[in-house]
Amino acid sequence: MALAGGPDSFLHHPYYQDQVEQTSPHHPRDLAGPGFPAQPDRLAPHQEDDVDLEALVNDMDASLESLCSASETAPLLHNGQHARGPPPPGARPLRPQASPRHRVPRSQPLHILAARRLQEEDQQFRTSSLPAIPNPFPELCGPGSPPVLSPGSLPPGQAAAKQDVKVFSEDGTCKVVEILADMTARDLCQLLVYRSHCVDDNSWTLVEHHPHLGLERGLEDHERVTQVQHTLASESKFLFRKNYAKYEFFKNPTNFFPEQMVTWCQQSNGSQTQLLQNFLNSSSCPEIQGFLHVKELGRKSWKKLYVCLRRSGLYCSTKGASKEPRHLQLLADLEDSSIFSLIAGRKQYGAPTDYGFCIKPNRVRTEAKELRLLCAEDEQSRTCWMTAFRLLKYGMLLYQNYRVPQQRKAVLSPFSAPVRSVSENSLVAMDFSGQTGRVIENPAEAQSAALEEGHAWRKRSTRMNILGSQSPLHPSTLSTVIHRTQHWFHGRISREESHRIIKQQGLVDGLFLLRDSQSNPKAFVLTLCHHQKIKNFQILPCEDDGQTFFSLDDGNTKFSDLIQLVDFYQLNKGVLPCKLKHHCIRVAL
């Protein structure tokens, strides 16, 4: 900040006045000179002594030059503190003018070039009795900087860069979102959840979709969206969908790593928990091994080879199942590649099975000849290979991504209302027929209690229908259409489409959806995932006392509508292999 005016402009500053009174060796009378008439000292006694006029003028000139030299070294420059000490050797005094009246004109700005050279020297002369005041305008102290702020004087990276990202939903709708350049996939998902008024259960994911290559993968929560977007082709796009299996291997690793596929390099055996720790520990070296169908680069043929996955890459054996270094050939590197699942491997690449996946180098955009295509024998094997690839590549980053939502929930829990968490371990069958309740431990008795609960739900629904309904529709008509308002009902979709949706949103136990039956127009189908397998259960209508009910078990447990049926099987397993936990959902952006 340039300071205008002559040296006397400092004298009007109160802080400078205190410094002058404390440190200036000159008497106020000595500060007067040509152009600065001295004020008469009213307190001093009038002296009648003769004064040497020539000596007085010389003293006044010397005092004025000393003051100008001190002004050039800017005693107020650093944090408003007066620098005590001699000026640096590099500081040049002002040139003497021909006339003393033009030596310090009032309109001349303060010369601060010499003062800038004092920035480092002044640090050691700064007084310790006064607090350090930070410079509010550091960009003005650089050499060649203008005295006023301008957009060009700001650092080039200070302004946050923004970029537009187009995100598609499952129903084909899209939304253009303006995001920051450093926004991660998790942050963008939370933004879309907020704007779409969805429930944030930390299972949303951003999917990188390549329709021309038949590939897709879920972005990791820590990945920057703009960096991934720069590698996409014009046909590629981002999808916003659920993925309940994103971190399921941390909760139940036994379903993801079969014992016959996992080998140990440092120890011969270990538990599943130790296996995860070895995957997360960069110093250990667990391996995944097994036979895979491998497509040759540039050809349409597939070969079944013995493959092993390590931290250094994916290798195949050129001699049976031998893992000797001279028999191993590198197929793909983990660092500069990403793993994708094949959407239609049989149709597009002639894959021998439906459980294909691909390791795609990050530099590849449109060419399929550089893709490393592989196929497993079943879904569990494919999930094991893909999960191990993610763990070996990202390590602790995945565990940190998994822990972040839980840590946020723990921080916010004291500020939120307590919500009861319903889980399998906290639910037991109870008998309240007597004066006190008791836990039913006999499985057969618990099954009969579940059937009685179903009859109780049916009676309560019938009683409500008899009392009347506020809906203009007839109660029986309302019970047959009210399920269409639920997210878990997907209408008239085929069996293949329902299986595809469940696979996309994660093969976890309890993932389900309801749809119209294609074989029976009056029936419905419950599609449920259990142990990474998809099963279908038909829901048939039945009549009792003129009322229409729905049942999964041939009329043993009846419900007046599908909402009651879903609510019941979320709490009771009944005839199903597991309880209903997660429902497939499609959100329109």
From Swiss-Prot:
- Residues that bear Phosphoserine: 99, 145, 413, 423, 426, 471
Regulation acting on activity, per entry: Phosphorylation by mTORC1 stabilizes and activates GRB10 constituting a feedback pathway by which mTORC1 inhibits INSR-dependent signaling.
Subcellular location(s) per record: Cytoplasm
Which region ranges are annotated with the description Disordered? Answer: 1-51, 77-107
Q: Which GO terms describe its molecular function?
A: insulin receptor binding; signaling receptor complex adaptor activity
Q: Which residues form the Ras-associating domain?
A: 161-245
Q: Which SMART domains match?
A: PH, RA, SH2
Domain SH2 per the UniProt entry, residue ranges: 488-584
PANTHER family tied to this protein: GROWTH FACTOR RECEPTOR-BOUND PROTEIN (PTHR11243), GROWTH FACTOR RECEPTOR-BOUND PROTEIN 10 (PTHR11243:SF4)
Under the subunit heading, UniProt states:
Interacts with ligand-activated tyrosine kinase receptors, including FGFR1, INSR, IGF1R, MET and PDGFRB in a phosphotyrosine-dependent manner through the SH2 domain. Poorly binds to the EGFR. Directly interacts with MAP3K14/NIK and is recruited to the EGFR-ERBB2 complex. Interacts with GIGYF1/PERQ1 and GIGYF2/TNRC15. When unphosphorylated, interacts with AKT1 and when phosphorylated with YWHAE/14-3-3 epsilon. Interacts with NEDD4. Interacts with LRP6, thus interfering with the binding of AXIN1 to LRP6.
Q: Know the name of this protein?
A: Growth factor receptor-bound protein 10
- Source organism (scientific name): Sus scrofa (Pig)
* Biological classification of the source: Eukaryota, Metazoa, Chordata, Craniata, Vertebrata
State the gene name recorded for this protein: Grb10
